[in-house]
């Protein structure tokens, strides 16, 4: 054990990390627990696409804290780090790096193989940087054997999983309308779009379509005019009422428009802005059912020759029923283009309508006069065309939310394409029931998860990209039959090409392989790659190379992952193993700035974890993030709260330094025999630290990390530093081998060692540093090789409750002193306490005297002047009009007598029964008394001062100033000094006491090394001008 100085947490971090690296501590801990019970954790993989942000840091700190806790419990923790390395997050970054504008550029300017190489290089480079950032936070994970979806073994597990899906008839290829990114030129799944809706300003267009066999018009509303050239149907709700609106124009002409009756006024109000309408009226109202089957003339028939062909098909350009039609806006008639919307697609399929989606992968039209035009660039032209044909009812703008690409942030299109799907709809009910068995933290996430899953459709797993796990599906060019390959060995066996290197099965190498179909035709691989969420969904079993289900005992990610990663891994495990892949799942919130705004470059409010740790050290950030609020709530990052956390850890360090330095001075060697001599305050702190340990373990098991850290903070600040250290400070000045001193040292040693064991999961660097200084030769070499135990025999609930009362009393005395401006250095002659706590005060009154600086404690009812105040609210309920008579009866009895009578229950006066709740007794307190209420009654403090009180207070004033001067001179604790005091005359007893407290000798003359002059003002307004000289005792 060595003496301890002040701490710099950043430097401490570096020192401890160097120690761990030198001693290979992480691996030693794993080896130590190798035969312990297994604890399986799956790391939700961050994308290797840049530096970590504060949210990523929070996520890893949560994980590291839980896993460190499990290690010190003796568990063999399976803790592979994970990385997301495929997909659009990487591709988009590489495209930007090489100024690539399209998929075509990838193939023509750089080449597929080079692009794949660059994506791999980019991912690996960022992996290394991010790993360093995580290690800087003190994170212990198995980075050496981290799972990487770009490795062949992992990719093979993706193939094996897809083959299992195929064998269970859960894999299908289908033409469906879904999300399409025109910039990335690929389809996207619905879970990739959740949370990616942004507010946009789009056209708001009302259009009239002429009915084929009459001069009447149906009206529709759309925010995507570019889809009108592809219109195939119009939907109505059969149950709604539709009005035939006679519209008269200023030029004397008239038309009939069909609009849902409830929306007529809203639509006509808009129509009047763009048309010279003189008046309108409803001629008749019919049910939507009567409109079904009516045919209309496509509004852009001449502009799109393809529509002229479709018009010849029986059900095309017809009004059909649709349950999705509402009266929340629009006209009550819905424009339907089956190629550009899920509802549209399903309606079209139901009525055998051709799926017409005339746009290419870049989002440009392939038919009509708008051929070659990007769809959003068509809007104004389409509107102008409608105006020229007198078919526009109204045109404006509307703000609404619209889906964007989750990586490049481009507005998405709804487009019908052929894709590969996992048929989740077939197993959704099982997934929901399995999800209900998970231990969700907090428990309300279960409802959110189940509700989210209930709305998911089949999973679109195919992506028209390059950097990903290639779909292991080969399709025959002759008969269209397809086969799913489940492993590299199977592919080698089936391949026509025997010399292809399959050490890497990414594109384009795997694309070169052909198979032979049973019909004799050539089979080529479908060019698509798998959704990157499929990659991470494989993690529970692919990360450990297992084809058997091993449920994770703990996973945690941010709240955006509830229906993303939590779902994707469950879905794949359900497909393969018919079960969920995890037992306990915790959701955490997002990190925001101090005002609650999302952090972003544009707002300039991003907080870098590297910057924070450089300023504060990793442990301060770790403790702050886990204690700022409940983990599942969004966290508003605050530098002032970081300062408070650092201050709290500094308080712990100072308490440790105080303890260690005195122990070193006295050559203290820990020995459990000293526990035989503990005092009440020692027994209490031994009980408290084990109670806190018990609470901490319970909180970490849940895990409720806020409960864990709040319990630690409260113990450090209130129990240990502000209470126990103060109680035993005088014992550290006793003779070297005094049993009271030794028992205090033994208690301090035990409490600090127990405390850092509990804190080690959240403050690993600080805990390790203290442990290394305090550990004895027979202890494990690292705190993380030392098992966390709870000594229940030390826990004494009665003692803790009694001490809580004593602390309340002391706090009340301090409040009373503040009220009276009576500082703690001046003793109080007497306090009066209620008799109901006599037993507790008789046992521990000495603590009240020491900590409150009180000379005498009196246990009795305070004898002040008692007055009675009737409780008119209660009296009114019972006596109503008789209240004045009851009040008179109460006032007829002396207050002291009434109080005594009511102590034994109800009391009858003038035929009225008086109950205790009918009155309130107040005590008038004399000027020399201050009363303070606490949970058991009141503390009454006598604030009268006499000469003895003043002298004792001045002694403390002088001691405090000499100690302050010692600190200024940077003197060691045991360094003796000579002191010369002028301005106050003390008796020899008082001088002797001061000399003992400050380790000094009072002398008449000295060669001063340091002089300070002070003015002391006592509570009774006396003033003393003093001068203190100190000379080092050489």
Curated annotation (Swiss-Prot):
InterPro entries hit by this protein: aa-tRNA-synth_I_CS (IPR001412), aa-tRNA-synth_Ia (IPR002300), Anticodon_Ile_ABEc (IPR033709), Ile-tRNA-ligase (IPR002301), Ile-tRNA-ligase_type2 (IPR023586), M/V/L/I-tRNA-synth_anticd-bd (IPR013155), Rossmann-like_a/b/a_fold (IPR014729), tRNAsynth_Ia_anticodon-bd (IPR009080)
Coiled coil residues, start to end: none
Domain-level remarks: IleRS has two distinct active sites: one for aminoacylation and one for editing. The misactivated valine is translocated from the active site to the editing site, which sterically excludes the correctly activated isoleucine. The single editing site contains two valyl binding pockets, one specific for each substrate (Val-AMP or Val-tRNA(Ile)).
Subunit-level organization: Monomer.
Family: Belongs to the class-I aminoacyl-tRNA synthetase family. IleS type 2 subfamily.
Keyword hit for Cytoplasm: yes
The organism's place on the tree of life at top rank: Archaea
EC number in record: 6.1.1.5
Its job: Catalyzes the attachment of isoleucine to tRNA(Ile). As IleRS can inadvertently accommodate and process structurally similar amino acids such as valine, to avoid such errors it has two additional distinct tRNA(Ile)-dependent editing activities. One activity is designated as 'pretransfer' editing and involves the hydrolysis of activated Val-AMP. The other activity is designated 'posttransfer' editing and involves deacylation of mischarged Val-tRNA(Ile).
Gene Ontology biological process terms from the UniProt entry: isoleucyl-tRNA aminoacylation
Cofactor(s) recorded in Swiss-Prot or TrEMBL: Zn(2+)
GO cellular component assignments: cytoplasm
GO molecular function, one term: tRNA binding
Keywords: Aminoacyl-tRNA synthetase, ATP-binding, Cytoplasm, Ligase, Metal-binding, Nucleotide-binding, Protein biosynthesis, Zinc
Enzyme kind, highest EC tier: ligase
Sequence motif 'HIGH' region, residues: 46-56
Protein localization: Cytoplasm
Binding site for ATP: 601
UniProt short sequence motif 'KMSKS' region, positions renumbered to this chain: 598-602
Primary localization class, coarse: cytoplasm
Catalytic activity entry: tRNA(Ile) + L-isoleucine + ATP = L-isoleucyl-tRNA(Ile) + AMP + diphosphate
Entry protein name: Isoleucine--tRNA ligase
Cited CDD domains: Anticodon_Ia_Ile_ABEc, IleRS_core
Gene3D superfamilies, A to Z: HUPs (3.40.50.620), Isoleucyl-tRNA Synthetase, Domain 1 (1.10.730.10)
């Amino acid at each position: 054990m060595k003496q301890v100085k002040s701490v710099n947490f950043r430097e401490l971090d570096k020192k401890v990390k160097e120690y761990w690296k030198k001693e290979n501590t992480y691996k030693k801990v794993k080896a130590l627990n190798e035969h312990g019970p297994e604890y399986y954790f799956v790391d939700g993989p961050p994308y290797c696409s840049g530096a970590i942000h504060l949210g990523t840091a929070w996520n890893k700190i949560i994980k590291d804290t839980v896993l460190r806790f499990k290690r010190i419990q003796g568990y063999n923790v399976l803790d592979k780090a994970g990385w997301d390395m495929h997909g659009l997050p990487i591709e988009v970054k590489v495209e930007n790096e090489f100024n690539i504008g399209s998929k075509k550029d990838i193939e023509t300017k750089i080449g597929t193989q080079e692009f794949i190489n660059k994506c791999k290089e980019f991912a690996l480079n960022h992996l290394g940087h991010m790993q360093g950032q995580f290690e800087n936070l003190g994170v212990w994970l198995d980075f050496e054997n981290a799972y990487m979806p770009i490795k062949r073994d992992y990719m093979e597990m993706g193939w094996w999983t897809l083959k299992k899906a195929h064998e269970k008839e859960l894999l299908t290829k289908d033409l469906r309308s879904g999300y399409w990114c025109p910039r990335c030129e690929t389809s996207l799944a619905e879970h990739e779009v959740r949370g990616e809706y942004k507010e946009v300003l789009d056209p708001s267009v009302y259009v009239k379509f002429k009915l084929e066999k009459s001069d009447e018009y149906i009206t529709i509303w759309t925010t995507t005019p570019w889809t009108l050239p592809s219109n195939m149907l119009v939907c109505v709700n059969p149950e709604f009422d539709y009005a035939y609106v006679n519209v008269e124009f200023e030029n004397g002409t008239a038309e009939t428009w069909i609009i849902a009756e409830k929306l007529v006024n809203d639509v006509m109000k808009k129509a009047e802005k763009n048309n010279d309408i003189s008046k309108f009226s409803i001629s008749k109202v019919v049910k939507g059912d009567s409109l079904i089957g009516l045919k209309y003339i496509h509004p852009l028939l001449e502009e799109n020759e393809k529509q002229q062909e479709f018009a010849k098909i029986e059900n095309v350009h017809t009004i059909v029923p649709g349950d999705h039609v509402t009266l929340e806006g629009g006209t009550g008639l819905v424009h339907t283009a089956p190629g550009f919307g899920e509802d549209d697609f399903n309606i079209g399929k139901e009525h055998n309508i051709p799926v017409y989606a005339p746009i290419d992968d870049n989002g440009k039209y392939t038919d009509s006069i708008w051929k070659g035009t990007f769809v959003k660039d068509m809007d104004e032209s389409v509107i102008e065309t409608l105006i020229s044909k007198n078919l526009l009812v109204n045109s404006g703008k509307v703000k609404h939310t619209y889906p964007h690409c989750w990586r490049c942030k481009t507005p998405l299109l709804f487009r019908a394409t052929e894709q590969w799907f996992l048929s989740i709809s077939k197993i959704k009910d099982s997934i929901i029931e399995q999800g209900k068995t998970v231990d969700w933290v907090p428990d309300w996430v279960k409802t959110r998860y189940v509700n989210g899953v209930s709305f998911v459709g089949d999973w679109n797993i195919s992506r028209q990209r390059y950097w990903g796990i290639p779909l292991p599906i080969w399709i025959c060019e002759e008969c269209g039959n397809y086969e799913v390959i489940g492993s590299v060995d199977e592919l080698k066996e089936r391949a026509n090409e025997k010399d292809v290197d399959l050490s890497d099965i990414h594109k384009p190498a795997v694309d070169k392989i052909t198979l032979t179909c049973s019909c004799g035709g050539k089979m080529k691989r479908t060019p698509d790659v798998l959704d990157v969420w499929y990659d991470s969904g494989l993690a529970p079993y692919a990360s450990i190379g297992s084809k058997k289900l091993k449920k994770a005992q703990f996973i945690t990610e941010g709240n955006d992952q509830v229906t993303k990663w939590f779902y994707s891994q469950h879905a794949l495990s359900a497909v393969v193993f018919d079960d969920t892949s995890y037992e306990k799942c915790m959701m955490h919130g997002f990190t925001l700035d101090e005002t609650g705004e999302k952090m972003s470059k544009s707002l300039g409010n991003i907080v870098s974890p590297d910057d924070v740790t450089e300023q504060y050290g990793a442990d301060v950030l770790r403790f702050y993030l886990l204690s700022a609020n409940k983990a599942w709530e969004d966290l508003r990052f605050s530098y002032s709260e970081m300062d408070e956390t650092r201050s709290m850890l500094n308080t712990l360090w100072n308490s440790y330094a105080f303890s260690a330095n005195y122990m070193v001075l006295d050559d203290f060697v820990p020995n459990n025999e000293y526990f035989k001599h503990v005092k009440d305050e020692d027994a209490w702190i031994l009980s408290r630290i084990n109670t806190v340990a018990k609470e901490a373990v319970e909180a970490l098991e849940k895990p409720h990390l806020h409960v864990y850290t709040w319990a630690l903070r409260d113990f450090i600040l209130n129990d240990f530093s502000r209470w126990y250290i103060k109680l035993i400070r005088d014992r550290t000045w006793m003779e070297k081998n005094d049993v009271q001193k030794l028992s205090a040292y033994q208690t301090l040693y035990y409490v600090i060692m127990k405390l850092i064991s509990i804190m080690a999961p959240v403050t690993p660097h600080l805990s390790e540093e203290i442990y290394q200084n305090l550990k004895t030769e027979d202890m494990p070499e690292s705190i993380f090789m030392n098992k966390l135990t709870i000594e229940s025999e030390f826990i004494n609930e009665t003692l803790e409750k009694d001490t809580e009362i004593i602390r309340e009393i002391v706090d009340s005395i301090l409040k009373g002193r503040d009220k009276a401006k009576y500082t703690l250095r001046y003793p109080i002659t007497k306090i009066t306490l209620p008799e109901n706590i006599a037993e507790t005060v008789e046992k521990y009154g000495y603590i009240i005297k020491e900590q409150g600086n009180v000379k005498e404690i009196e246990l009795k009812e305070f004898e002040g002047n008692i007055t009675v105040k009737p409780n008119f609210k209660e009296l009114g309920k019972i006596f109503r009009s008789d209240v004045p008579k009851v009040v008179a009866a109460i006032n007829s009895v002396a207050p002291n007598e009434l109080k005594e009578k009511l102590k034994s229950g109800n009391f009858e006066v003038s035929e009225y029964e008086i109950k205790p709740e009918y009155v309130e007794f107040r005590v008038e307190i004399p000027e020399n008394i201050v009363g303070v209420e606490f949970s058991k009654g009141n503390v009454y403090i006598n604030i009268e001062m006499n000469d003895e009180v003043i002298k004792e207070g001045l002694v403390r004033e002088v001691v405090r100033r000499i100690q302050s001067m010692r600190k200024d001179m940077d003197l060691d604790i045991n360094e003796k000094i000579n002191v010369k005091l002028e301005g106050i005359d003390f008796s020899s007893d008082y001088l002797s006491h001061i000399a003992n407290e400050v380790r000094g000798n009072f002398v008449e003359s000295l060669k001063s090394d340091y002089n300070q002059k002070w003015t002391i003002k006592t509570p009774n307004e006396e003033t003393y001008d003093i001068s203190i000289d100190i000379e080092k005792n050489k």
